[in-house]
């Protein structure tokens, strides 16, 4: 029985899931907007939001924890230099998931995952639409 088991398997091994969400979190922090399937988007929240909460307090220990979870120096730098300061007064809820229809090949429900309060300019909207 599968009682009290949290999280989605997504037809992947645990190592594959961990690597996938690690990569998705790095992409989200880099671009601030990504497009993925709805179940992956909902599960990505469980990975990305605690990292942003960690970045709100800049310390060597927190930077090492963030690097351990992302394995990307660029992502850690952006987390602590930009995102941690941007969300310093927000008590959670850093991500927004917007449903955006269904994928053409397999009809999978798709969604955009974006950081709330991100700076929006005309170029970012053109890049997101493509």
From Swiss-Prot:
Q: Which UniProt keywords apply?
A: Ribonucleoprotein, Ribosomal protein
Q: Cite the Pfam families for this sequence.
A: Ribosomal_L17
* Entry GO terms, CC: cytosolic large ribosomal subunit
**Gene Ontology terms, MF aspect:** structural constituent of ribosome
In terms of Gene3D superfamilies, this protein maps to:
Ribosomal protein L17
First and last residue of the signal peptide: none
The lineage's top-level taxon is Bacteria
Return one Gene Ontology term, BP aspect: translation
From the UniProt record, list the coiled-coil ranges: none
Q: How does it assemble?
A: Part of the 50S ribosomal subunit. Contacts protein L32.
Q: Give the family this protein belongs to, as stated in its UniProt record.
A: Belongs to the bacterial ribosomal protein bL17 family.
Report the protein name in the record: Large ribosomal subunit protein bL17
Lineage of origin: Bacteria, Pseudomonadati, Pseudomonadota, Gammaproteobacteria, Pseudomonadales
